[in-house]
């Protein structure tokens, strides 16, 4: 039994939760065939994802230092040579791995590498990849992991319908779990029907309503296998440019988001997606000052308009798109104060120290840290990480 469960066994009632978590979260298949697209648009029912695990998370947090809590806020770009020391010294919430990390590896070797890290971490680590399929594949591009790389969900759906989509998505989830990966940063919930859009080849290339139904199915497939998924890139990419290399300013109306972009996110949330990843686009109709991932107003949309109670993840704060939008201080500090729970970063130690200093200087309320950490740990318990 994993380390966090060993901690929980000693706590009254918590052990009971450990035995029933799968039935509660994944045992009941959602009948997506009954999805009414008007309901997708109008449904505003709040679903509390991890509330039953908050007491367990709070008990664990009582024994955590401030340093450990701050570390839990970060999903760190993986570096094999530094990962062990980071776990020992800075207590990260987890790592995000990229294609280079799977080169010259096998299923067994990467599993052993991840297991070794898990064994020295007090709190189980999130191990994430972007294995969307098609244009973005980190794992299946290598023949040691799969004979051929996964195609995009769109390609599978276009050629084999829902049956093939379900088969390949569940195969993907099973493969990732077998290697020690517990979070797939997918599916792409963006709406695009224009082949010239930067994001188009990663989408279903369908209108908002059809995309919403398919996204709901994708979330359900992942949940049935038991891997965490993540809707991206909230609040919707549209026809914007690549934010890995520059900022994208979205001039669309608020009504456009309500009537289109929000629909797939709403359906994913209705199907109990545990995490949502926020983009670096500037959404002028919501917040013309900050990229979405650093915007308290955008995060409020996700929490209050879409009633999302799960983990909010930033896109990588080391991307060019956020540079220049933080005049004084740190992008990580702004992200925490904006309501993000988990910060993806390629500059971990620097951002960790900035957040620690901000708490010391009372620029971040410790209650804000505690709220995010409690949600992150409750998520880890719920998904048996």
For the regions a language model picked out, list residue spans one by one.
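Alpha-helix-loop-beta-strand connector modules within alpha/beta enzyme cores
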Residues: 117-127, 206-227, 292-313
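Extracellular glycoside hydrolase catalytic/binding regions
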Residues: 249-259
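Generic structural signal for hydrophobic
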Residues: 86-87, 117, 176, 222, ...
